[in-house]
A protein has these predicted regions:
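Short cysteine-rich clusters marking metal-coordination/redox-active sites
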Residues: 208-211, 277-280, 293-296
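PTP/DSP superfamily signal
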Residues: 2-9, 82-97, 114-272, 288, ...
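Glycine-rich nucleophile elbow surrounding the catalytic serine of serine-hydrolase chemistry
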Residues: 106-112
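Short functional micro-motifs and their immediate structural scaffolds
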Residues: 107, 216, 285, 299-302
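Conserved tryptophan-centered aromatic signature that marks the ligand-binding surface of SH3
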Residues: 286-293
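Cys/His-rich Zn2+-binding "zinc-finger" mini-domains, especially FYVE domains
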Residues: 267-283
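Glycine-rich, flexible N-terminal cofactor/catalytic loop recognition
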Residues: 13-54
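Short polar/charged helix/loop
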Residues: 32, 40, 50-56, 62-94
Length: 328
C-alpha cells in the first residue's frame, strides 16, 4: 500500500511552545498558556506527568486532561491514547487550541502527539514520529513508548481491548509493574465460559478431558511465533505481541491463554504454580508470571499454559449453551 506523506506545516522557532499542527503545541512542564503579550495562546491543556498539576499550572486553560505516567518504558500510555486523541480532536474541531505538556517536553508529550498524528492523519508510527522530530529535534520518547505506539499502529490506531495484541500487552505490563502479583484488576480475567449461556458462533470452547467442565474459549488463546530460548521483555521485542495466527504452531503441545476467572484464587500472591481443573482438580498445566518455554522453543511471558492432551475442543456450539451446560 502506498504510504501517505506527513502533513506539511513549517517548523516553528517559538521557544515557549512548539506548534506541531496549527493550534496544537507541545512543551515542557514549566511553560504555560500565555504568549509573548501575556494573552492566552491556548485554550486546553493535556498534561502527562507523575502527579496532577496544581491550580497555578492550570490557570488560563478552559479545559484540561491529566494522564498519570512516569517517563519510563513500563509506563502505560497505550490504554490512554484514544482518550487523548478524542480530547485533542474535540478541542481543535471546536476552534480551540491545545498544549500537550510533560516535564521535559521530549518523551511523554511527544508520544501523545505522535499517536494523535497517526490516528487523525493516517500515518505510520515512523512517519508521524519523523514529522515531530523534524519540527522538534530534541524529541526522543523512550523505547517503551515507541513499542506501545507500534502496537497502536498494529491495532489500526484504536485501542481494542479484545485483541490478542492488547491482551498480551496488558499481561506483560502487569508482570513488569506488579512484581508481587497481588490485587489483580478484574478486567485481566476472561469470563468463565461455564458461567455464561451464550457465546459467539465462531468461538470454540475447551473443556477438561476428565470431567468435561468448560475451561476457556478460543478467543482466550494467545498465539505466538515459534522461537528459541528466553526473549527479552516485550518493550525490547516489538515483534513478539504482534497479530499472530494459530497456524505454524503444530510443534506446540500446550495452549498459552489469558487468565480465566476460575484461576483467580490460584494466581494471587504467587509467581508460579499449577493450573488445576476447578471441578475435578486434575492437573491442566501451569502458570509463571516471569514466563515459561513452549515445546516449540518460544519463551512466553507471562505464561498460563494448558496442555493440549488435558482438554478437548467443543466446536461451534451456536448461540445457546443452556442445554449443553445442563448435561454437565
Amino acid at each position: 500500500m502506498q504510504e501517505r506523506a506527513p502533513p506539511s506545516f513549517p517548523p516553528s522557532r517559538t521557544k515557549a511552545m512548539v506548534p506541531v499542527l496549527p493550534r496544537l503545541y507541545v512543551s515542557g512542564a514549566d511553560l504555560g498558556p500565555a504568549d509573548d503579550s501575556g494573552k492566552p495562546a491556548v485554550t486546553a491543556l493535556l498534561q502527562v506527568d507523575s502527579e496532577p498539576p496544581g491550580a497555578a499550572a492550570l490557570a488560563g486553560f478552559e479545559s484540561t486532561l491529566f494522564v498519570q505516567a512516569l517517563d519510563r518504558p513500563q509506563s502505560d500510555l497505550l490504554s490512554r491514547l484514544d482518550d487523548c486523541a478524542a480530547f485533542l480532536s474535540q478541542v481543535l474541531e471546536g476552534g480551540g487550541s491545545a498544549l500537550v505538556r510533560c516535564h521535559a517536553g521530549v518523551s511523554r508529550s511527544v508520544a501523545i502527539v505522535t499517536a494523535y498524528l497517526m490516528k487523525t492523519n493516517h500515518l505510520t508510527f515512523q512517519e508521524a514520529y519523523a514529522f515531530v522530530q523534524a519540527i522538534k529535534p530534541d524529541a526522543k520518547m523512550n523505547e517503551g513508548f515507541e513499542w506501545q505506539l507500534q502496537l497502536y499502529e498494529k491495532m489500526g490506531c484504536k485501542v481494542d481491548v479484545n485483541s490478542t495484541i492488547y491482551k498480551q500487552y496488558r499481561l506483560k505490563n502487569i508482570t513488569e509493574n506488579c512484581p508481587e502479583i497481588e490485587g489483580l484488576p478484574g478486567h485481566v480475567f476472561a469470563i468463565d465460559p461455564n458461567t455464561v449461556h451464550q457465546i459467539l458462533n465462531h468461538d470454540t470452547l475447551y473443556r477438561c478431558r476428565k470431567c468435561r467442565r468448560l475451561l476457556f474459549r478460543s478467543s482466550s488463546i494467545l498465539p505466538h511465533d515459534e522461537g528459541k530460548g528466553p526473549a527479552a521483555f516485550a518493550h525490547k521485542k516489538v515483534s513478539e505481541p504482534g497479530p499472530l495466527s494459530h497456524a505454524g504452531q503444530t510443534n506446540c503441545t500446550s495452549y498459552f491463554i489469558e487468565p480465566v476467572q476460575w484461576m483467580e484464587a490460584a494466581l494471587l500472591g504467587v509467581l508460579e504454580g499449577q493450573l488445576l481443573c476447578p471441578k475435578c482438580t486434575s492437573k491442566l498445566g501451569s502458570f509463571h508470571w516471569h514466563g515459561e518455554q513452549c515445546s516449540c522453543g518460544h519463551w512466553v511471558t507471562p505464561a498460563f499454559q494448558v496442555h493440549k492432551n488435558r482438554v478437548d475442543e467443543v466446536k461451534r456450539l451456536g448461540k445457546h449453551l443452556g442445554q449443553f451446560l445442563g448435561k454437565m
